[in-house]
Amino acid sequence: MTACSVQHGTIRLERRYKAGPQRVFAAWAEPKARAQWDVPGRWVIAEQSFDFREGGRELKRFGPRDDPRFVADTLYLDIVPAQRIVFSYSMTSRGEPVSVSLTTIALSADGKGTRLLLVEQVAFLDGRDNAANREEGLASMLDKIGESLGA
């Protein structure tokens, strides 16, 4: 039997965007809008299904352009338009488990703009990822949302 390990982490990120909550929500809910930011840095999406609804399941294969080795399997648990998105996802790399996460996105009006709060509770499996790497990736994606909104 191979030794296994688990490290738990909680990531909390906040962003303020000039766009209103409806537009920020649409960045998650609309496939063309999400395609502009849905992977960190210069990574690419090689394959993706899109089913953004409560109970909807999405599969995405992504990673560096020359090696999109990661697969995220996402289940949407709760969606309140322009206010809240709650989902769980597992991530694998070349078929090996990397992590399992529960993520909450809270949107609230902030003047004419939006405050976005992301909280991700994650179990990192067998040392294949860590909180610092995940936080960097999530922060990059949130920054790309702002760029896509012109905010």
Regions found by a protein language model. Give the residues of each.
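A short, structured loop/turn motif at beta-sheet edges
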Residues: 21-22, 51-53, 77-84, 106-115
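Helix-adjacent hinge/juxtasegments
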Residues: 59-81, 87
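Short beta-edge strand/loop motif at the mouth of beta-sheet-based domains
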Residues: 12, 32-69
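Beta-strand/loop substructures that line and gate deep hydrophobic ligand-binding cavities in soluble
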Residues: 88-140
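Hydrophobic pocket/interface hotspot
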Residues: 24, 34, 58, 76, ...
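Hydrophobic/aromatic beta-strand elements that line small-molecule binding cavities or substrate pockets
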Residues: 15, 47-50, 72-78, 101-108
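Intrinsic-disorder/low-complexity, polar/charged segments enriched in Ser/Thr/Lys/Arg/Asp/Glu/Gln
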Residues: 8-14, 21, 45, 57, ...
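Hydrophobic ligand-binding cavity/cleft-lining segments
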Residues: 1-44
